[in-house]
Amino acid sequence: MSSIETYMQSVGEQTRTASRAMMRATGAAKNQALLAMAEAILAQRAELQAANAKDVAAARANGLEAALLDRLTLSDRSIALMAEGLRQIAALPDPVGSITATSVRPNGMRVAQMRVPLGVIGIIYESRPNVTIDAAALCLKSGNATILRGGSEALHSNVALGRIVQAGLQAAGLPTAAVQVIDTTDRAAVGKLVTMTEHVDVIVPRGGKGLISRLAQEARVPLIKHLDGNCHVYVDAAADLAKAHDIAFNAKTYRYGVCGAMETLLVHADVAQRLLPVLGQALHEHGVELRGCARALQWLPEGKPADDADWATEYLGPILAVRVVDTIDEAMDHIARWGSGHTDAIVTENLSAAQRFQREVDSSSVYVNLPTCFADGFEYGLGAEIGISTNRLHARGPVGLEGLTTLKWVLNGEGQVRG
């Protein structure tokens, strides 16, 4: 066994043991730990930023692009937001132990389901140190233990944040091994983590499509994941066009780099001539490159011809594919063929069209008269999220505290026997 395998095996064993203690942890103890972490993050701002400066300097020397450098940097504001996020998670209801789906059988036996932690969650992520705190906090609050493997470019930052997390656990009388930060940059650690079925119950990857595709191929542990967010807005024949304009513009331009950004606009032929010239001009003036089908280009003078690659692409940038369709069926067929199952929306004042779209479009979130950029756990009232899942099993859509738990059946009786 290699040194990395030995190290990861030890981490897995410690975390599995800690997970059993976390299942018994009270809500008060978990909240105490979270609040202690929030105080420590603010109190140790200078130490955190000193560790982060090492990561930023190395990343800059290695030519990391500006957008990723920005994500990597722990500014005063980002540190304050991490502390506030911890307080917000502490204030959320504890899902563990809640009882649902109760019934009484004819023999008097009481049947219910209880929400319980998943166990040990492995989180694999890239350059954002704040994920260390977000992931640790959500796993802690939901009664799980977690193994965190951040990007090599953020190693010093993640290790420093991990020490704060473990100090918070210790202050609340919880096992420090309940949150462990992998302190090696060896990629073999990731390969071992995703195959440790005896110690890890689920993996949550947060990163680019390349990372997630690789993990999906290598993992033996189940993944909560989405590969990409190729999101659509369909403007129906019965749409309010002022509403459609604002929704489509917001869905594309709110933030280009989020997985809920609209990447393809589908417009019914009956309204294309009235909507596309105005909307296209607004998007063009905002710096969005438009790529359209032949029919759409009639009303998009600045547009370029689209091909199949455009329908399949999550741009994560100021590019939008536009297609004119003749029916809602054609729109839904397009989404079924090219979509990623993330988030799709219809703009319409026709109730039956809205209901049909929500029923038949097979995505984790389906909206009526809303922009796709609402795909976020905070906007859903979840308080926070570990990520967004397009899986059909277990969690689907934004994954908050409840998505980090599972259900077990609990039955109570008075001595009944089965005849």
Curated annotation (Swiss-Prot):
Catalytic activity, EC: 1.2.1.41
Family: Belongs to the gamma-glutamyl phosphate reductase family.
Keyword Ribosomal protein included in the entry's annotation: no
Family annotation (PROSITE patterns): PROA
CDD domains per record: ALDH_F18-19_ProA-GPR
GO biological process: L-proline biosynthetic process
Transmembrane segments: none
Protein's UniProt name: Gamma-glutamyl phosphate reductase
Keywords: Amino-acid biosynthesis, Cytoplasm, NADP, Oxidoreductase, Proline biosynthesis
Record function comment: Catalyzes the NADPH-dependent reduction of L-glutamate 5-phosphate into L-glutamate 5-semialdehyde and phosphate. The product spontaneously undergoes cyclization to form 1-pyrroline-5-carboxylate.
Reaction catalyzed: L-glutamate 5-semialdehyde + phosphate + NADP(+) = L-glutamyl 5-phosphate + NADPH + H(+)
UniProt-listed NCBIfam families: PRK00197.1, proA
Broad class of where this protein is predominantly found: cytoplasm
Keyword Iron tagged: no
Pathway: Amino-acid biosynthesis; L-proline biosynthesis; L-glutamate 5-semialdehyde from L-glutamate: step 2/2
Cellular compartments per GO CC: cytoplasm
Organism: Bordetella parapertussis (strain 12822 / ATCC BAA-587 / NCTC 13253)
GO molecular function: glutamate-5-semialdehyde dehydrogenase activity; NADP binding
Localization in the cell: Cytoplasm
Class of enzymatic activity (EC top level): oxidoreductase
Domain of life: Bacteria
